[in-house]
């Protein structure tokens, strides 16, 4: 998840019915630099997912459904009006 402060950037949200699998601790909300570039790292290996935001680990979760997943990687923006998202320097590496 990438969202404004207070909305769990770095957490894992599944939009196909399960909702939040894991949200970030409140004390990590200030790691997000609003209005500036942020660096997000996502590592998925088997059923383990780890996320980092600006070098700080945000979550680490094991989930069988994620581990069974196959397919494509997509970048998604939800409706909400007035949101502008930019991506740069995307890198994907096979583990």
State where each predicted segment sits.
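Carbohydrate-interacting regions of secretory-pathway proteins
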Residues: 1-95
């Amino acid at each position: 998840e990438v969202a404004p402060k207070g909305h769990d950037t770095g957490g894992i949200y599944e939009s196909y019915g399960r909702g939040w699998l894991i949200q970030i601790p409140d004390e990590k909300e200030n790691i997000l630099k609003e209005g500036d570039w942020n660096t997000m790292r996502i590592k998925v290996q088997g059923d383990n997912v780890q996320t980092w935001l600006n070098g700080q680990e945000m979550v680490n979760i094991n989930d069988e459904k994620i581990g069974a997943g196959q397919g494509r990687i997509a970048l998604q923006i939800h409706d909400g009006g007035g949101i502008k998202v930019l991506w740069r320097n995307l890198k994907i590496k096979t583990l």
